[in-house]
């Protein structure tokens, strides 16, 4: 009779526990590893690369007003050596300088060359205006074999002023130019350093030569330094070029008595442009906004590992070749044994496995959403995604890449290492600063991605917990948590009942009476099982005590009757 009652109780217990609903999240067999603030190599369901490594080995110029300077150097467009004759005036928003380009024909250099190059790269092109200088008592047609066109010539935008006759007196002269335009004027002039004192006397007459230039913001005097130098282009002399930006309504004045290379036209900047030094081929079939010496970077990513000196609208250069940004939840691949041996897994882990946090295992079959339910009842088993929690997580994660780009995007300009001897210290400082910035941004990039990854994983876990709490609040005392993300329901719950739990329309009062009755039956079985264990342990303890007591009594009787003797030796 007792056996029959126990069997009935166990049958009721098993029947009640047959209905179950579990919460789970999407998983894949092979996820992507990302780093967070607290841990490296966490596997997530989805992730995207944030560091661009693909380079287009061409200058993509589609949609750009591009000028390829070829053999002409950018600074040469302002003074006009023969190789720059076609570029004395131009308009462009992309300026390409080639390695073969040269700024000068007669040997010499530009003062503060790199700053002027930067100004011209951003200029959008240049236009010119005649300065209106006229000269009497001097020749204005100085020329040299170093600047050949069809014959010896000179810079197209400059006048080489000479004495009227060899060794003749060069008169003291003063010339002024007022900028009547609304934008600054670029004014360039030169100082000629003859190859010898005799040559200087022949060209400009005897005596010391002095050139003074001034405006409201500038004043400088120059004295030529004649003397032998190594020949370049057949010339032992040198011409050094100087420049200033003349504000609107300001006037520049030149006072000189020889060795002066006079400007003929002032240059005005047209607008804005990008300038790049590259020997890469132009391609009108592709578009780009970020350029470097090796070509074009076309990317929507926030970082790049291609060239630290790219210019334009570019991703930030970082030292890392890869920084993965999590765009999905933490991945816990479904155990392969679960796929192959369902019955074994039911015995080992239950029907569904475990999920997020306390919910340890993911579901690879949950393809319609990030979160969902699996249930088991008399009608069978089923899986359904929860779209609301999925969308909530997606809405908060969407745009992470764009936010990273907003934090890092910047227009970059090219600062080269083409420094003269005087500027080398400045060049070293610029290079050191650039290297330091790269170090800082490499660290910042890693930190930013790690912060976003931490937020994504915490966020997706939070949505999972919200969903779990929603189900728990609905079921109340009608179900019991098993600690693995599942609820064992104490009443018959068909597919409509399961759907009401998922839809948040479950009425716990409707099933309360049945659930309480089944819970009492289950608790009774658990209670009987508990008493049985206590009795077992009590019986075992009592038996041991009784055995020891009998053994001690027998030993005492034997010793008393002389049948047993105890000898103690010291």
Swiss-Prot record:
<feature type="glycosylation site" description="N-linked (GlcNAc...) asparagine; by host">
    <location>
        <position position="46"/>
    </location>
</feature>
<dbReference type="Pfam" id="PF00509">
    <property type="entry name" value="Hemagglutinin"/>
</dbReference>
<keyword id="KW-0732">Signal</keyword>
<dbReference type="GO" id="GO:0075512">
    <property type="term" value="P:clathrin-dependent endocytosis of virus by host cell"/>
</dbReference>
<feature type="lipid moiety-binding region" description="S-palmitoyl cysteine; by host">
    <location>
        <position position="566"/>
    </location>
</feature>
<feature type="transmembrane region" description="Helical">
    <location>
        <begin position="534"/>
        <end position="554"/>
    </location>
</feature>
<dbReference type="GO" id="GO:0055036">
    <property type="term" value="C:virion membrane"/>
</dbReference>
<feature type="disulfide bond">
    <location>
        <begin position="493"/>
        <end position="497"/>
    </location>
</feature>
<keyword id="KW-0564">Palmitate</keyword>
<feature type="disulfide bond">
    <location>
        <begin position="72"/>
        <end position="84"/>
    </location>
</feature>
<keyword id="KW-1162">Viral penetration into host cytoplasm</keyword>
<dbReference type="GO" id="GO:0019062">
    <property type="term" value="P:virion attachment to host cell"/>
</dbReference>
<keyword id="KW-1032">Host cell membrane</keyword>
<keyword id="KW-0261">Viral envelope protein</keyword>
<keyword id="KW-1160">Virus entry into host cell</keyword>
<feature type="disulfide bond">
    <location>
        <begin position="290"/>
        <end position="314"/>
    </location>
</feature>
<keyword id="KW-0945">Host-virus interaction</keyword>
<feature type="glycosylation site" description="N-linked (GlcNAc...) asparagine; by host">
    <location>
        <position position="30"/>
    </location>
</feature>
<dbReference type="GO" id="GO:0020002">
    <property type="term" value="C:host cell plasma membrane"/>
</dbReference>
<keyword id="KW-1133">Transmembrane helix</keyword>
<keyword id="KW-1170">Fusion of virus membrane with host endosomal membrane</keyword>
<keyword id="KW-1015">Disulfide bond</keyword>
<dbReference type="GO" id="GO:0046789">
    <property type="term" value="F:host cell surface receptor binding"/>
</dbReference>
<feature type="signal peptide">
    <location>
        <begin position="1"/>
        <end position="18"/>
    </location>
</feature>
<feature type="glycosylation site" description="N-linked (GlcNAc...) asparagine; by host">
    <location>
        <position position="335"/>
    </location>
</feature>
<feature type="topological domain" description="Extracellular">
    <location>
        <begin position="19"/>
        <end position="533"/>
    </location>
</feature>
<dbReference type="GO" id="GO:0039654">
    <property type="term" value="P:fusion of virus membrane with host endosome membrane"/>
</dbReference>
<comment type="function">
    <text>Binds to sialic acid-containing receptors on the cell surface, bringing about the attachment of the virus particle to the cell. This attachment induces virion internalization of about two third of the virus particles through clathrin-dependent endocytosis and about one third through a clathrin- and caveolin-independent pathway. Plays a major role in the determination of host range restriction and virulence. Class I viral fusion protein.</text>
</comment>
<keyword id="KW-1161">Viral attachment to host cell</keyword>
<feature type="disulfide bond">
    <location>
        <begin position="60"/>
        <end position="286"/>
    </location>
</feature>
<comment type="subunit">
    <text>Homotrimer of disulfide-linked HA1-HA2.</text>
</comment>
<feature type="glycosylation site" description="N-linked (GlcNAc...) asparagine; by host">
    <location>
        <position position="503"/>
    </location>
</feature>
<dbReference type="InterPro" id="IPR001364">
    <property type="entry name" value="Hemagglutn_influenz_A/B"/>
</dbReference>
<dbReference type="GO" id="GO:0016020">
    <property type="term" value="C:membrane"/>
</dbReference>
<keyword id="KW-1165">Clathrin-mediated endocytosis of virus by host</keyword>
<feature type="site" description="Cleavage; by host">
    <location>
        <begin position="349"/>
        <end position="350"/>
    </location>
</feature>
<feature type="topological domain" description="Cytoplasmic">
    <location>
        <begin position="555"/>
        <end position="570"/>
    </location>
</feature>
<keyword id="KW-1167">Clathrin- and caveolin-independent endocytosis of virus by host</keyword>
<keyword id="KW-0946">Virion</keyword>
<dbReference type="InterPro" id="IPR008980">
    <property type="entry name" value="Capsid_hemagglutn"/>
</dbReference>
<feature type="lipid moiety-binding region" description="S-palmitoyl cysteine; by host">
    <location>
        <position position="569"/>
    </location>
</feature>
<protein>
    <recommendedName>
        <fullName>Hemagglutinin</fullName>
    </recommendedName>
</protein>
């Amino acid at each position: 009779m007792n056996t029959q009652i126990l069997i009935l109780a166990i049958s009721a217990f098993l029947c009640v526990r047959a209905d179950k609903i579990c919460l789970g999240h999407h998983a894949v067999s092979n996820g992507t590893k990302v780093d967070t603030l607290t841990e490296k190599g966490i596997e997530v369901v989805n992730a995207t690369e944030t560091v661009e490594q693909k380079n287009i080995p061409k200058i993509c110029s589609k949609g750009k007003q591009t000028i390829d300077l070829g053999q002409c150097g950018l600074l040469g467009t302002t003074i006009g050596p023969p190789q720059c004759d076609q570029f004395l005036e131009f308009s462009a928003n992309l300026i390409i300088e080639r390695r073969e380009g040269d700024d000068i024909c007669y040997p010499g250099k530009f003062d503060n060359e790199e700053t002027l190059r930067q100004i011209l790269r951003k200029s959008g092109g240049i236009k010119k205006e005649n300065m209106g200088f006229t000269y009497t008592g001097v020749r204005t047609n100085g020329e040299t074999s170093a600047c050949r066109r069809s014959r010896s010539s000179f810079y197209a935008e400059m006048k080489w002023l000479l004495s009227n006759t060899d060794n003749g007196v060069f008169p003291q002269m003063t010339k002024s130019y007022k900028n009547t335009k609304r934008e600054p004027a670029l004014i360039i002039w030169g100082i000629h350093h003859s190859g010898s004192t005799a040559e200087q006397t022949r060209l400009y007459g005897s005596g010391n030569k002095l050139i003074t230039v001034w405006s409201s913001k500038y004043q400088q005097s120059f004295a030529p330094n004649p003397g032998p130098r190594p020949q370049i282009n057949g010339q032992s002399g040198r011409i050094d070029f100087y420049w200033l930006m003349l504000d609107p309504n300001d006037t520049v004045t030149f006072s000189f008595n020889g060795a002066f290379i006079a400007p003929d036209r002032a240059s005005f900047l047209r607008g804005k442009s990008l300038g790049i030094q590259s020997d890469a081929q132009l391609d009108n079939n592709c578009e780009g906004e970020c350029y470097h010496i090796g070509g074009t970077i076309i990317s929507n990513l926030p970082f790049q590992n291609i060239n630290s000196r790219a210019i334009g609208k570019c991703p930030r250069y970082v030292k890392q070749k890869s920084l993965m940004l999590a765009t999905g939840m933490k991945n816990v691949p479904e155990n392969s044994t679960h796929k192959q041996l369902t019955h074994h897994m039911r015995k080992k882990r239950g029907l569904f496995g475990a999920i997020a946090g306390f919910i340890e295992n993911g579901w690879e079959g949950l393809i319609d959403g990030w979160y969902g339910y699996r249930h088991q009842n008399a009608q069978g088993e089923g899986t359904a995604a929860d779209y609301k929690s999925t969308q909530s997580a997606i809405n908060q994660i969407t745009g992470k890449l764009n936010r990273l780009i907003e934090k890092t995007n910047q227009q970059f300009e090219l600062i080269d290492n083409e420094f003269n001897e005087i500027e080398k210290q400045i060049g070293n400082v610029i290079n050191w600063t650039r290297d330091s910035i790269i170090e800082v941004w490499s660290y910042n990039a890693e930190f930013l991605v790690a912060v976003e990854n931490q937020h994504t994983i915490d966020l997706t876990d939070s949505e999972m917990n919200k969903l779990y709490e929603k189900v728990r609040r609905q079921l109340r005392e009608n179900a019991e948590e098993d600690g693995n993300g599942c609820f064992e329901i104490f009443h018959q719950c068909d597919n409509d009942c399961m759907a009401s739990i998922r839809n948040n329309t479950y009425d716990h009062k409707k099933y309360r009476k049945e659930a309480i009755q089944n819970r009492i039956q289950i608790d009774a079985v658990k209670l009987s099982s508990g008493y049985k264990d206590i009795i077992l342990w009590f019986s075992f303890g009592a038996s041991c005590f009784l055995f020891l007591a009998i053994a001690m009594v027998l030993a005492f009787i034997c010793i008393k009757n002389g049948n047993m003797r105890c000898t103690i030796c010291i």
